[in-house]
């Protein structure tokens, strides 16, 4: 009779484990491993190439998200320094205009007409405001008019998002100016970090309530990043970098147009241009080569067939030249009416 000592038991376990391991990996010892009716194989069958691709996609997605969050955090940290510098400059500017007028100092200010209009507009909104949260919301409408257009991309924006992946944040640098204006109007220029966060939370609730009324139309959706393919690897990388900054295809079109036709928008000559020549209505056709670049960047990102994407892209170009929403100041009365309610 075999006496099972501890040593014998350990040896038996090792032998059984090795035998089981060889049984599993040796197809000649177990022919049914190749049988498709084998339950475990059906349940756990994995194609190695497909698995590798999936893992690569997950890894890339994780890396992109990590990179995005890192960049957002860096921007937020930089914005804090910007806030302190901007506030000092703003207070000095306000002291300066107590002894003179904006008209007197305007010649020494770069882009003085735009600066003068901006200051006049935001001052009017501030004077009409009765509530800090409503003032912030109105200034968001004023400073980010393109986010509140027909594509309703504001749905994806928050001041203090719970998730930096699901929602984007408004430009922290513009938010700094809004914060300074609110502190001047309601808190005697005192820095109120905790109060500002509470106001931001209240404004986010207002944005959520407004978002519930709208959806982003399917024609403005963008493809998932992994499905975007350009004509080359370099093109694909460049397009993805552009798309990372956008919520909708309309926003992508606008971003590309502002880069390619910067001079037209800066000078105001954009009003005379459209996608095609239109002699009857007095419009000049845009540069064909630049328009081809717009199509090459935008169309691969749209979740529709290329012929349809081309038509939609053309419509979005014309729409933007008819009313370029990035130009602020057009909705001043709307903002004043909002804070006055």
UniProtKB/Swiss-Prot annotation:
One of its GO terms (molecular function) is DNA binding. The keyword Transmembrane helix applies. Keywords: Early protein, Host cytoplasm, Host nucleus, Host-virus interaction, Inhibition of host innate immune response by virus, Inhibition of host RLR pathway by virus, Membrane, Repeat, Transmembrane, Transmembrane helix, Viral immunoevasion. It is found in: Host cytoplasm; Host nucleus; Membrane. One of its GO terms (biological process) is symbiont-mediated suppression of host innate immune response. InterPro entries: BEN_domain, Poxvirus_E5R. Changing residue 95 to K: Complete loss of nuclear localization. The chain crosses the membrane at residues 7-25. It is a single-pass membrane protein. Its main location: host cell. Pfam families: BEN. Induction: Expressed in the early phase of the viral replicative cycle. It comes from the Viruses. Residues 112-222, 233-328 form the BEN domain. GO terms for cellular component: host cell cytoplasm; host cell nucleus; membrane. Belongs to the orthopoxvirus OPG067 family. Interacts with host CGAS; this interaction inhibits CGAS-mediated type I interferon response. Major early protein present in virus factories. The presence of BEN domains suggests a possible role in organization of viral DNA during replication or transcription. Plays an essential role in the inhibition of the cGAS-dependent type I IFN induction in host dendritic cells. Mechanistically, abolishes cGAMP production by triggering host CGAS degradation via a proteasome-dependent mechanism. This is Protein OPG067. It comes from Vaccinia virus (strain Western Reserve) (VACV).
